Amino acid sequence: ALAEKAASLMAAILGWTEQQFRELGKGKESADLALHLVTVLQGASLLTHTFNQPDLLLRETARLREWVNAL
């Protein structure tokens, strides 16, 4: 039950993120772009908490911001 709820939440986050890329005009690649963005954020969050190093998340979000702006 918990896994299903977590999957539902992540699906909603991915869906919303994909929609944002669609609104930016990214069309067919929107789902892949959304998956990349969410995957990087989740991984950075995990490592930030694991190593108790908030700067990891700050660095990755800065890189992602540059990446999105370059799209």
Predicted regions and their residues:
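Amphipathic C-terminal alpha-helical segment
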Residues: A1, V38-L56, N69-L71
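Short coil/turn segments at secondary-structure junctions
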Residues: A1-E4, F21, G25, T48
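Residue-level recognition of alpha-helical structural elements
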Residues: L2, K26-L33, Q53-L57
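Extended, well-ordered alpha-helical scaffold segments
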Residues: A6-I13, L56-L64
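Hydrophobic alpha-helical bundle segments that form small-molecule/ligand-binding pockets
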Residues: M10-A34, V68-L71
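Alpha-helical scaffold segments in carbohydrate-active enzymes
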Residues: W16, V40-G43, R63-E66
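Amphipathic alpha-helical interaction segments
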Residues: D32-T39, R59, R63
